């Protein structure tokens, strides 16, 4: 099996809001970064208490761009290796996206989905396979 590494347009987009429901429905990030530098946050959903006691919710979404143009046959299998840790249980999903030539704040909601999953169970093994457009 050929090994394909992600490219130089990898990065993240982050959004924050005082309201969790509003944040989940956000379509544009407040900041984005595409660089060959290092970021220790691949995905994150968190609730933070700010100085003064106000609450802010934050979502980081990471983007990894793979050049698959050299693949000439239809793949029968693929493996994506991701390492990480969680402070508690939670689901994360790998979803196709249509990010721009340069990753930007507008790519935050560039996911290729059909419909929305009804719920996530927090086990870390959830599936949204039926909602992913391939």
Predicted regions and their residues:
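Flexible, small-residue-rich N-terminal segments that precede or flank a structured functional core
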Residues: 1-68, 100
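A ubiquitous, low-specificity "background" feature that marks scattered single residues
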Residues: 31, 46, 73, 113-115
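Beta-strand-rich interaction/scaffold domains
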Residues: 86-134
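Generic detector of low-complexity/intrinsically disordered segments
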Residues: 5, 25, 52, 82, ...
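Extracellular/periplasmic catalytic domains that process cell-envelope and extracellular macromolecules
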Residues: 57-59, 72-74, 86-88
